[in-house]
Amino acid sequence: IVKTKKHFSYGKLLEILEPSPHRVTPACPVAAKCGGCQLQHLSYEGQLSFKTKKVKDHLERIGGFSGISVGYAKGMEEPWRYRNKAQFPVGGKTGEPEIGFYAKRSHRIIDTPVCMLQNKINDQIVKIIRAFLTEYEIPLYDETTHRGLVRHILTRIGRRTGEIMVCLVVNGRKLPHCDVLVERLREIEGMTSIVLNVNTAQTNVILGTEVHVLWGKETIRDYIGDVQFEISPLSFYQVNPLQTQVLYQTALDFAELEGNETVLDLYCGIGTISLFFAQKAKHVFGVEIVPEIGRAHV
């Protein structure tokens, strides 16, 4: 036991005396080091059970409700390689890039050549960029000194359209030899957008507000149900499009709209919920604090 609260305690696992029937060997070789996944030691069925119980516990313990009926978590047919967005921090010494994800509760980069949650095309994209950074000895960003150029790699992939976006986040206004990198990335089937995002702020915020197109378009397209969306590097868009459609359809079914209602969608982003509900409601109003994102479908 490492910490005790009034009604619960925190503990640290020291030894497994008898494994749960749901305990499995993580599919990812760096699962024990990377902070991206916390439940890979559980079977997928075990994860769904854990999440269902967690919702029920929170409603009862934090919300103070009792006798609440909580439906079982709806799972995916294939719970791997589902993410349509990846954000890879870049660091290490110049010529020896580390690209991957942060270790748990830290900003120490765990070099990750392969991620089991990301689209497979990301493995190829990272491999190309890693070779480029090494070959041209591009300065890599150091979060402690705020020196170096390349901070992050952001990718977005349209699940339905197959369109791909690659965004390099840089601590400056230019990327040396970017024409070489563009030519190499363009060889990937589906490549639609290659952009540079300028972030010179001395913060942990990943993206800046300034975007320059190096090749192709500034946006890619994807669908949720029958609704098409244009997605920029700055857009908020659900990272699991298959389950997003399940989630939105479930909410729409629960709403039992008859076609005369007005729906208000707060913090609407690019309007994924707004436009999905517009199929049934009379009026839908989306409210967004970021003007550029809010105007994406105007």
What name fits each language-model region?
Residues I1-H212, I224, D253-N260, H297-V298:
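SAM-dependent transferase fold signal centered on methyltransferase-like domains
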Residues H177-I188, T192-H297:
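Rossmann-like S-adenosyl-L-methionine
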